[in-house]
Each structure stands twice: as C-alpha cells, then as structure tokens.
Amino acid sequence: MRLSLTKVVNGCRLGKIINLGKTGDHTMDIPGCLLYTKTGSAPHLTHHTLHNIHGVPAMAQLTLSSLAEHHEVLREYKEGVGKFIGMPESLLYCSLHDPVSPCPAGYVTNKSVSVWSVAGRVEMTVSKFMAIQQALQPDWFQCLSDGEVSCKEATSIKRVRKSVDRSLLFLDNCLRLQEESEVLQKSVIIGVIEGGDVMEERLRSARETAKRPVGGFLLDGFQGNPTTLETRLRLLSSVTAELPEDKPRLISGVSRPDEVLECIERGVDLFESFFPYQVTERGCALTFSFDYQPNPEETLLQQNGTQEEIKCMDQIKKMETTGCNQEITSFEINLKEKKYQEDFNPLVRGCSCYCCKNHTRAYIHHLLVTNELLAGVLLMMHNFEHYFGFFHYIREALKSDKLAQLKELIHRQAS
C-alpha cells in the first residue's frame, strides 16, 4: 500500500492510495469516504441495488460490534469475511464500533475493551481481538483502543492520559501478534489517535503512534456538538501536523458535509458515510447542492431549489425552538410532511440516481406514510449516490482550486 499525493493546498490533500488489497491491484481516491454497512451489508440494499449506485467507494466499513458474535463461524469458514458476505472483490475496513450506535461508557480496562452486539456486551482482550481479525481477514482494521474519551464532554486529565497509555499498549500488543500471524501479514493495522480535548495528550498520542509501524491513522473522539467545533478543529490541525505525509488519515464520527470540508482543510483523507443512513432512517432525502459551477441554463431551477432550502431552514429553526425533531438538518427534506403528497418532482432535479430518474417525492411520501419497506430502499439509493457525488465534487474542486467556492456554497446551506 502506498499513498500518492498529487496536490496539497492549504492542508487539503488530493491523491490516491494505490497497491491496496491483498493482491495490490486496488486504488482509492482521497479525499473520499468508506461505504457504511450493517453486518457487512449496505443498509436497506441488496448487492444488485448497490451496484446500481454510481460512485460507490472502493472500501466498505465493517464494524466489529456487529461481527464479533459470528467470529467462530468465520473461523471455521477460513476464507475471510469478504467472501462470506458476498463482497470478495471489495476492500474491507473493520472498525471497533458502529458510528451510529453510542456505546455505554465504563467498560474499558487495562486488559480489554468492550464492544456491543445485538446480544449484548462482548469483552475484547488483545488476543481475542486479533483472533477475530484472523477470522475476518480484513484489508485494514482499527487497532484496539480506549475510545471512551472524546471532545464531547470535559474529562479529567488523569482519565485522558490513561486513555492514551492504554491505546498505545494495545497497539504494541496487536502489532506483536500481527507479526506472529501468517494470515494477517497482508492486513494493515490502523493506529488510533486518542486524547480527548487535551492538546498535550493528543500530541503525545499522535507522536507515539507515528513511531509504530502502522499503515495509517484513525482520528478518534473528534465528534461533538457545534459549540465545541472550534476546539475540535484546533486540536485536529495540531494532530495532523504531527503525522507523516505518506500515510492515510481517517476520522471517526464525522460525516456532515460542512464538518467534512472543515476536516479536509486540516489534512483528513477518509470519512465514514453513516450520514446518508441517518437521513434515510429519518424518512428524509439529501437535497443540498454541491455544484459550485452551475449551468447558467439551470439558474431558474437552482433559484427554486434555494427557496425550498430557505423554507426548510426556517422550519428546522421552528422545530428546534419547540424541541421537536432536532436531528433534521438543512441538508435534507422531510418527505413525511404532507406538503409532498402532491409534489411530482424528483427528489433532486438533475440527479442521476435510480430513485430520481424513476420516482417522485409524492411517491416516496406515500411509501413512508404507509410504512412500505421500499421507501428505505429508494431513499438509501438516492442518499448514498448524492453523498458519494459530494466527495467527487470535493476532489474536482481541489483539482481546479475551487474548494473555497464549494465550502461557501455548503456553509450557506448549513444550519
């Protein structure tokens, strides 16, 4: 695996990760995202419908929490999780936790980390964790770490220091066991940067992890509420400055379009794509614009779309003041609302996804209010394609030095 940078502008990194996978014949563009999955499958979608989506990332994200209870079956299967789930050609990255599902705190010790499956808590020692990775045989996997400390809330310096110490100890033990394993020789360990909101510990974690022979870095614990954004971004800039240029940087828990752009400007390469899934689960469709050089002939359509965005933002503000449905963002529209009952427009004008080419907002509204499973399928197809298209436009904007225009467009739509 090798990271090839073609351009670095104001911290933003444009390039490719080449020689990926066990055969070394895969590539992945950066900045980019991973394909979010549930137990190895894209939510709501079959493999056939997934193949109808344009721009699907080369690497899928699996979560250890959803696969841990099946590791004995996979160990007996002996051919890895990729073939087992019907994705033998895909690159696979195994993370510890599902970014959508919060984990209870207080279950990390000096010897183990807990993950939470459908059946409950699964305690992971280093040896058990590496045995499961041997059964899964992923291309990349997140190292075991103490990720209970984040920027979300203030934590004592003593607890933050313990988090960094534990994570480094877990990393050393995992690297030792990887050396002893023939099966995992072609798998890449991703080192985890911890440290909460304490600058000194963040920098120590970054410097010490960079000394180890890891294939890349996961920036953990940077998710949080808007009030902590400035602090998080300052920490992020300092951490990425300590990391080597020739290894990829992933970030967990960050997926909103406006936050993605802020992180890219601070040197982050890869993101999780759970945001489209969350939008789908709310019965919403992504409608934000990322075309920073619109066709003049489409100006009228763009103006109509802008008016709708303004109405949507006003509605969100009203909901926030009443304490209702605060999760909905200005990047989406809520198709459960009655006003879409007779709206025969596509979800997004000009969108090339299967849903927009074949169905209308009114039809999706009908599917949602009647609780039809097809609603989730069509919304997931659209939301994934829209989100993956956003990353394509980010790369194009970097190539043409237009990221500032794209960022301005996205922030005008953010609430």
From Swiss-Prot:
GO biological process terms held by the UniProt record: tRNA-guanine transglycosylation
Classification via Pfam families: TGT (PF01702)
Positions that bind Zn(2+): 351, 353, 356, 382
InterPro entries attached to this UniProt entry: QTRTD1, Queuine_tRNA-ribosyltrfase, TGT-like_sf, tRNA_ribo_trans-like
GO molecular function: metal ion binding; protein heterodimerization activity; protein homodimerization activity; tRNA binding; tRNA-guanosine(34) queuine transglycosylase activity
Oligomeric and partner information: Heterodimer of a catalytic subunit QTRT1 and an accessory subunit QTRT2.
Family membership: Belongs to the queuine tRNA-ribosyltransferase family. QTRT2 subfamily.
Protein's UniProt name: Queuine tRNA-ribosyltransferase accessory subunit 2
Species whose genome carries this gene: Pongo abelii (Sumatran orangutan)
